[in-house]
């Protein structure tokens, strides 16, 4: 099991008239990407602001490698805020150089690192361009470059792809996964289902200041909600009634019914059970003309836990 590097222990945070976090407890493991998934105001940004020392908890403890957060070396953490924070009157290279010098990175190493980061973020041709001339997507990529120029072991990203077009989002995702390849630990906040699903080793679903569930995306989709939907069409529709009766023995079956001469099954972890379903149908002498499956999604999980959809 990976080493725990950050522990949020029974954290509460209150503002006048609002309880932003309500007894939140989770651990961040070395080398993982964790997503905090929830709506605006759910408590995601409050959580990471406390992790990096920008806010103090009302109660509870935050530990880094088992020690109080006051022992945290600021060079070990990189923060990419939701708002773009760049010097518009400087070039891309100059922005990164200024930040690098603040972290006392040696001049030769800093220049090499800047060029590598710009290449990774597809910004090499913008090296000598003023920030003010960049598109919104390019500024977002520069924002994360500024947060990682000092090679931090922990990278904190607050809604990193907010408002990005699909191409810029993919470039940013590739860079986030590159941070994991380097052995860095990443925690990000998001309200985008596909972002949490694609990037995260684990997802924490937060709503109204409470941690509702924390697990891998795969496990969350396997165990929460009504499950996957399997649609079976038999060669002979007259077999449907008998096959439905037999399929009721399948484990974790939440529903089964006939619709438009097709058999519809709703069950958890259907992909794993698909061979058993096919074998059972064929063992009864029936033939499958067509089969399709719609897998449970993180959106389904979120709706099941909160009772509403998450905005996209």
Predicted feature descriptions by range:
Residues 97, 101, 108-126:
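Conserved ABC ATPase "signature" region
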Residues 174-268:
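ABC transporter nucleotide-binding domain
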Residues 60-73:
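Conserved ABC transporter NBD signature motif
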Residues 130-134:
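Conserved ABC ATPase signature
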Residues 52:
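Helix-to-loop junction immediately C-terminal to a conserved catalytic motif
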Residues 155-158:
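Catalytic Walker B motif of ABC-type/P-loop ATPase nucleotide-binding domains
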């Amino acid at each position: 099991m990976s080493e725990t590097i950050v522990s949020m222990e029974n954290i509460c945070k209150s503002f006048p008239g609002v309880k932003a976090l309500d007894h939140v407890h989770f651990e961040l493991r070395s080398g993982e990407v964790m997503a905090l998934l929830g709506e605006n105001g759910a408590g995601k940004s409050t959580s990471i602001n406390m992790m990096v020392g920008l806010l103090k908890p009302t109660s509870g403890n935050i530990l880094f490698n088992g020690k109080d957060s006051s022992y945290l070396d600021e060079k070990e953490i990189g923060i990419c805020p939701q708002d773009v924070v760049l010097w518009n009157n400087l070039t891309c290279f100059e922005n990164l150089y200024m930040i690098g010098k603040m972290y006392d990175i040696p001049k030769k190493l800093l220049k090499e690192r800047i060029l590598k980061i710009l290449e990774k973020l597809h910004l090499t041709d913008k090296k000598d361009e003023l920030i003010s001339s960049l598109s919104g997507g390019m500024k977002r990529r520069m924002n994360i470059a500024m947060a990682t120029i000092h090679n931090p072991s922990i990278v904190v990203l607050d809604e990193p792809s907010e408002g990005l077009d699909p191409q810029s989002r993919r470039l940013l995702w590739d860079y986030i996964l590159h941070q994991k390849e380097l052995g860095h630990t990443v925690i990000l906040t998001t309200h985008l289902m596909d972002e949490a699903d694609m990037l995260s080793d684990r997802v924490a679903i937060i709503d109204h200041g409470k941690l509702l569930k924390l697990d891998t995306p795969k496990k969350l989709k396997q165990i929460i909600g009504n499950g996957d939907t399997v649609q079976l069409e038999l060669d002979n529709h007259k077999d449907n009634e008998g096959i439905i009766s037999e399929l009721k023995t399948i484990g974790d079956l939440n529903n089964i019914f006939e619709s438009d001469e097709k058999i519809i099954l709703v069950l958890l972890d259907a992909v794993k059970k698909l061979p058993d379903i096919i074998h059972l149908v064929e063992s009864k002498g029936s033939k499958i003309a067509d089969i399709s499956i719609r897998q449970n999604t993180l959106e389904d999980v979120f709706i099941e836990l909160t009772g509403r959809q998450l905005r996209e």
